[in-house]
Structure formats: structure tokens, C-alpha cells
Amino acid sequence: MMDALLKAGYRPEIERAVQQCLASQDLADHETGAVTAEAAAEHGSATAVEDGKRFRLFELSANCIDLNDRQVEVLLAMRQPNVVLFGNLLCDWECDALIESSRPKLTPSRVVNADKGTYELKRDVRTSSGAFFQRGETPLVAAIESRLSRLLGVAESRGEPLQILHYPPGAEYRPHYDFFDPARPGNQRVLSMGGQRVGTLIIYLNDVKAGGSTVFPKIGLDILPKKGCGLFFSYADDAGGLDYQTLHGGSPVVAGEKWIATKWLRLGDYLARSD
């Protein structure tokens, strides 16, 4: 596994984080901290999190996935939480084109207010800027969304708009969960747009000089940004409950800047509301 990471261009420093993560795997299997399917059902989320089992890509036996337009490498796969690191997901010019096309559209990033269901600025939590591309908005976006659909086996209609995020020096995203707590009243609005989120794919669009890793603090794993690579994780544990080990964040950029593309997947077809 480490040979594959090094071949893909990852620095040797990542070995320590990966080995620490793997060493703690047995403990994590027994002490997940995740809610059970029965507990999730009390809030109407059992069906949503059970769907996450479909994304357990660690079951793939191949180290390389043929998507017709390119060969995508599997560099790292974890069972619980379900985390997969892909190499060669995007080529350099695709990464560069996404960055340049997003620049005129960038606005300060917002977070969902779980009590009101509104999107609000919260600079003490998230200090990036971002831009959204609707499904098929450009030929490049359409080609990338088609590739991601083939990779994950998920219909394009279940994906939220592709989001491009820019993190200048010092910018970060504090640890958080991507799924919505159905017990919070404001989340009913966002859940009505396609159901629960079941998976996240982060694509690194540039190499970062220092900092800017994707960190999973509960399992001691840092993924360092590498241009063209993609990080996928889903939120269901083996029992079909929400896996709280998927707590993650974007560590502060120390030097240089960080660009990523994010695709969130829903239980059903995603349809944004206009109100």
C-alpha cells in the first residue's frame, strides 16, 4: 500500500499517519461511537444510512479501476470508517480548468444552520471561498460528473452541484460531519432536497506547500493534498448506523493555497429548492 502511495507522488510523511490509522483499526471496530440502526430509525434516518453500505468500495479487489477515459488507482482503502483514496482521478489540465473557471464565481463559504435550515456565514468555523457548478453546466463539468458516476456506481442525479473551494494561507474548515442530523428542525429543509447525504468525494486540484490536509481526528488520519487525487468516504457503519468516526475537517493552510472540488451524494435524486 505504501509503495502505491509513494508512486502516486505522496510524500513519505504520510506513512506515519496511515500506519497509526491501521494500528487503531481493531479498536475502532469495537468502539465506533456510532449510533445503531435502531437508534437512527427513531429519527427517520435508518433507510438513509443503510444506503451507505452500497458505497463500501474497499470490497473492490482491483488496484486500478478502468473508467474508459482513464485508469483510476486505488491508493488506500479503509473498512471502518469507509475511506478510499484514489489516484489519477483528474488530469492536470482538468484541475487547472476547474480552478480558473471558478475564480469569477467565488463567494465566502457558508454552513447550514441546523436549527433554521438556512445557509449562513460562520467565519470561526469555515474560512474558505467557493463556487458551485450545476449539473452539466460546462462540458468539463459534465465529463467529470459522468466519470464520478461510473467510479462510484451512483446516478448523476443523486449528486449535489460540484463545489470548488479555495483556501488561502490560514484558511481552514473546523472538524464537522457532512450528514444532516434529522433530529434538528432546520435540517428537514435540506433533507427534503434529496434525502440524507450518504457520501462525500473530495478532489484535490493542486499541490499545497504546507498544511491543508483533510484530517479525521477520531481515527488519527491525515490525507495530504495531491493534485488529481480524490478522497471518498461514506457515513454508514457495519450495523447501518451513522458512523461518527467520519468527523473530518480541513487543516489550516500553512504555505501556498489549497483548491479542492467537492461532490456530495444523496440518498435520492437531488433537487435544490428555490425558497
Q: Locations of the language-model features?
A:
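Fe(II)/2-oxoglutarate oxygenase catalytic core
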Residues: 3-232, 236-275
